[in-house]
Amino acid sequence: MDSKNVELYTPRKCSATNRLITAKDHASVQINIGHVNAEGIYNGEQTIFAFCGFLRNNGQSDAALNRLAQQKGFLKSF
């Protein structure tokens, strides 16, 4: 019988702070943004942002999402 090692938990990192998001961090969120073409049709690609609970508890997740979206080109920077 062939045995495989199956990972049940894959750790994630916060997109803004690079902190490790632990399994017990129930305040963390993951935001998936789908890419669309010129006609507005989803093309199967997505960008993933993960935010840790520490960032959300301090009220900095909105500013972090705006900063990351500007870096990726989703928002204009003025």
Swiss-Prot record:
UniProt entry keywords in alphabetical sequence: Ribonucleoprotein, Ribosomal protein
Any one annotated GO CC term: cytosolic small ribosomal subunit
Keyword Acetylation: no
GO biological process terms on file: endonucleolytic cleavage in ITS1 to separate SSU-rRNA from 5.8S rRNA and LSU-rRNA from tricistronic rRNA transcript (SSU-rRNA, 5.8S rRNA, LSU-rRNA); endonucleolytic cleavage to generate mature 3'-end of SSU-rRNA from (SSU-rRNA, 5.8S rRNA, LSU-rRNA); translation
Organism lineage string: Eukaryota, Amoebozoa, Evosea, Eumycetozoa, Dictyostelia
Family: Belongs to the eukaryotic ribosomal protein eS21 family.
A GO molecular function held by the record: structural constituent of ribosome
Gene3D superfamilies: 3.30.1230.20
InterPro entries according to UniProt: Ribosomal_eS21, Ribosomal_eS21_sf
Annotated PANTHER family: 40S RIBOSOMAL PROTEIN S21
Protein name as catalogued: Small ribosomal subunit protein eS21
